[in-house]
């Protein structure tokens, strides 16, 4: 049995969980998330917690057990607290701003790059260089942050580009020059 999967998921007071077969719907103060879990697991609500269990002893069921428990736990945390990821833009003339809901990034190209958020994702910008991606779905927040970082990944010589907050860039030495 999975060590992660066997732990029950506590349900906070303001969160409502609806189970119908393998479809899980979680409603909370931050929004609503729906997900259909793969076959091989069963999801049950016991008191104020959710228990995920494998339906058989097959390897595929046991593999999905911990995954499904973590997916449901991330849904519960997402609708109650939400998720956010911070990015930093490093470099002269590189900046970001929000126009409406769209994020406009000037990252050294001849044109500004526009990023349109999917439903449930919001962008906020502080000091023109710090971007925060926030939402209820952990996977979607991470994917959008990765898309923004991919516009101009940090380069190893001067560290210019878009990086996650707290990310360490492995720096390289420049050319040593002819002697």
From Swiss-Prot:
Protein name in the entry:
Large ribosomal subunit protein uL6
Residue ranges annotated as transmembrane are none
Answer yes or no on keyword Nucleotide-binding: no
Any idea what job this protein has? This protein binds to the 23S rRNA, and is important in its secondary structure. It is located near the subunit interface in the base of the L7/L12 stalk, and near the tRNA binding site of the peptidyltransferase center.
How does this chain assemble? Part of the 50S ribosomal subunit.
A GO BP entry: cytoplasmic translation
PANTHER family, A to Z: 60S/50S RIBOSOMAL PROTEIN L6/L9 (PTHR11655), LARGE RIBOSOMAL SUBUNIT PROTEIN UL6M (PTHR11655:SF14)
Q: Tell me the leader sequence span.
A: none
Q: Which GO terms describe its molecular function?
A: rRNA binding; structural constituent of ribosome
